[in-house]
Amino acid sequence: MSHNLLKGKRGIIFGALNDMSIAWKVAERAVEEGATITLSNTPIAVRMGQVDALAEKLNAQVIPADATSVEDLETVFAKSVEILGGKIDFVLHSIGMSPNVRKKRTYDDLDYGMLEKTLDISAISFHKMLQVAKKQLSLIHISEPT
């Protein structure tokens, strides 16, 4: 049941891969509540996942991007503002990946290079998103430090 809680709001949702993804469910619910959105994930995730099907279902556009790349994020935010017709009201960062886990490395056998990649993908990319949005003035509201 929709209550139009997000009617007229514009958002970018990062990380939808398939119908088991948190980002997927949030995207469905956001649109159900009246939001218009763009979707973003890595180019390989777009090719290998089902995000195109979600985009079609939600009448959303997919903007492939590597969230660890500031240049790619600049493109996502600029294109989203253009596609959605104005500044962005919300961003969902639902991104996480660990090469150590994928390679089944145990805690006492971590590869630190892979751990750095994990942090870049899963955490630092969020800061990069906010930094890009602030520089481009893409978001409706970003608090300033006092």
Task: Label every model-predicted segment.
Residues H3-L39:
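Canonical Rossmann dinucleotide-binding motif of NAD(H)/NADP(H)-dependent dehydrogenases/reductases
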